[in-house]
């Protein structure tokens, strides 16, 4: 694209190579590499080049990426705009082949944003590395969010306690520590500003599928749907109660003033790939397990996984043998071919 002052820009994707390289040389304790996600509007002139990221021979091989899609663009595609249909097909094909790009429906995020954002005209343009938070950003604010997850394997005990309220308060305390520690660090001004003015936190869950299996409830059953609704209503109600109590005790940040809240957001469903495995080999987040016997490749090593609830069932039927587990492994973790189930 041409530059007003003269010359020509190499385009958005060219500059993404810089972020990809920077992330590649950053590590957490020499174990986990840095990560970065780029979001680009689907109507951007460089989107076709963008969709070639991670392809064989492409300069960018590690970076996560996403397209942002508006309602008006989708309506045009559905109404038959051939260029939009062809581009959408390319997005879906790429996603089928690689898992990328994420698809972020921008208008959905803004329509469902907290009142404190909508009332103040604050716009959400993109999400984060794992697409679990929807927060606004602007020149002097770069969004940050403190995350944690409830282990639903323990839900029957959690619901009898104040664990949800306690976790909400804990996350707010973590945010306060971040605000204090980043106050005078160079180049952290934008994230510090966001943390101080929003105090956004995100409580999620892990072990949803494990909880269902422990109670012999089918993942797609009506019972599971009703249970899902009940659990998240409880989490929402309790987290709202906690942030309101915090506002009364400690005050409201800039963008919550007049709303009776300490935090602009309280919930977020993160993927929890590693943490769920550490916490009792629970299923990740709200997702189903992709098999009953497989090798888990995590930051700190490779670990074999045998579904503990299936193991208990096999023990009941006298079928918990190496031969049975080998047949499950050879079937990609599936038990559909086992005649006794």
Feature roles, as predicted:
Residues 1-341:
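Long, C-terminal-biased catalytic regions of enzyme "large/alpha" subunits
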